[in-house]
Curated annotation (Swiss-Prot):
Transit peptide limits: 1-65
Superkingdom, natural source: Eukaryota
Example of a GO biological process term: translation
Pfam families: Ribosomal_L27A (PF00828)
GO CC terms, sorted: chloroplast; cytosolic large ribosomal subunit
UniProt name for this protein: Large ribosomal subunit protein uL15c
Similarity comment text for this entry: Belongs to the universal ribosomal protein uL15 family.
PANTHER family the UniProt entry points to: 50S RIBOSOMAL PROTEIN L15 (PTHR12934), LARGE RIBOSOMAL SUBUNIT PROTEIN UL15M (PTHR12934:SF11)
Record Gene3D superfamilies: 3.100.10.10
Segments for region (Disordered): 67-90
MF terms (GO), sorted A to Z: mRNA binding; structural constituent of ribosome
Organism field: Pisum sativum (Garden pea)
Self-association and partners: Part of the 50S ribosomal subunit.
Length: 258
């Protein structure tokens, strides 16, 4: 018995035109190729909300590792700003969030910073800073001060020179900023037991007495001259010459002591 006799012709699908042959002559033949079933795995796509994921991570536990896909702001931390002056639809009412009347409801730049309604503002009620706190030149230091105690503890030997450079080398002073251009001044705190040669821009009165008593040689370095106009310098020279002559005449007119 053949395979064609097992399948009735009536069970064959009806073929529509344009087939022009005899349908009864068609014979169904078994397929020699095995049927292959291919299973395709569907990719699942999930949409994650950042804010919700951050909230879930916080509530799930502390052992959850933070990643780029679960980072987000905390719920309620980011609020939408008020849209003032954009009509009733912005949710601020008919006055659009500016109130009824007044200077703050008008157009323009508004009031100045620090304005308190006409009374004396706080930044004018407080006293002004004077001296070095206010940055005035009169309150700034004019010298790098060094006491006799610092020179004694620096380890200088007899006959050595004490100056701004040697004090820097021994790390007694470490001026910075504008202090690097200032001259040296010796103050009288402490005692000095060695005979030294001290070069400084100024000496205090008591320090000068102590150093002369200890046998030290003092050298006053010339200060930095301030620039003045030539006409002003000429007038200053004339005034100095005039007062020098006047002082000389007064000393000559004084009677000699008996």
């Amino acid at each position: 018995m053949s395979a064609a006799s097992l399948i009735p012709v009536s069970s064959l699908p009806s073929l529509a035109s344009p087939f022009k042959g005899n349908v009864k002559t068609l014979v169904a033949k078994p397929c020699l190729c095995p049927c292959l079933k291919i299973q395709r795995t569907k990719l699942r796509v999930s949409v994650v909300n950042k804010a919700a994921s951050a909230y879930n991570v916080k509530s799930s536990g502390e052992n959850v590792r933070f990643r780029l896909d679960n980072l987000g702001p905390q719920p309620g931390s980011r609020k939408r700003p008020k849209r003032k002056g954009r009509g009733i639809a912005a949710g601020q009412g008919a006055s659009c969030g500016f109130g009824m009347r007044g200077q703050k409801s008008r157009s323009g730049p508004g009031i100045m910073r620090g304005f308190e309604g006409g009374q004396m503002p706080l930044y004018r009620r407080l006293p002004k800073l004077r001296g070095i706190a206010g940055g005035m030149h009169a309150g700034l230091p004019k010298y790098v001060n060094v006491n006799l105690t610092d020179i004694e503890n620096a380890g200088f030997q007899d006959g050595e020179e004490v100056s701004l450079e040697t004090l820097k080398a021994k790390r007694v002073i470490n001026p910075s900023g504008r202090e690097r251009k200032l001259p040296l001044k010796i103050l009288a705190d402490g005692e000095l037991s060695k005979k030294l040669t001290i070069k400084a821009g100024a000496f205090s009165t008591s320090a000068k007495e102590k150093l002369e008593y200890a046998g030290c040689s003092l050298i006053v370095l010339p200060g930095r001259k301030k620039w003045v106009k030539p006409s002003v310098a000429k007038n200053l020279a004339r005034a100095e010459e005039y007062f020098a002559k006047k002082r000389g005449g007064e000393t000559a007119s004084e009677p000699a002591p008996v």
